[in-house]
């Protein structure tokens, strides 16, 4: 039963209930700075702690002590936006006017392009490997000592380990956090908001078991690509990619990839500005045991000199053509 005399602390990195009568200058450990998202990294501006994994980043312990506060923060997205990602001089900025050589593509307003989820298939081998590994992780966690107060690592859950088995259902988001064009949402339920605080308060869409421990798994991955028979194929080599967290979308000119791998303990976020146009509805994704294969149907039958559009190289080729 909730103690109505206690208030909710809205400091970033805290989120605990507190008694106003016992709120001194050492009561709260939090992040006074705002969140900052750049090149797949999630960063706290106050201490520069960063991670590509949203859950790991959210669980970084605060860097400052002070009193708890029950005042809800203003839209901190606007504050974070003041920080420049690339403060180039105006004359150094390259203006992108196309994804290919001039005249090769029909003119298209980028703001009107609609992203589509690519069809995802999972191989039987990948399904079996995931089930086996997750069972091993669950059994290991139950037998290992867990520190009292350890937070649940599932996205959207703030439950702390209290010494019992914590068998009550864990309401959480199994998907990955997506940040795109000012919007924040979970790939598992797609409830979008521009307010970071509202995003964090979204109730989980799935019930399951709490996860009080992170298992150390290598988070490295590599990628390559090739073209054959009218398809351009991107291979992302990583073990234990979780299908339910995969958010792979394309608007025909770009592809965005966000998913958890390492059986849920690492994440990858990739963005591709493609050299030429593809057909999303005729493209597909195959999640295997050790790699994720993204096959993109080419709209034009021409060969691709490279996977990504390069403003400098393609502008130069345009002039020489």
Curated annotation (Swiss-Prot):
Residues 9-68, 152-210 form the CHORD domain. The keyword rRNA-binding does not apply. GO terms for molecular function: zinc ion binding. Zn(2+) 2 binds at residues 31, 46-47, 63. The keyword DNA-binding does not apply. Zn(2+) 3 binds at residues 152, 157, 170, 210. Keywords: Metal-binding, Repeat, Zinc. GO terms for biological process: centrosome duplication. Zn(2+) 1 binds at residues 9, 14, 28, 68. It holds the Pfam family CS. This is Cysteine and histidine-rich domain-containing protein 1.
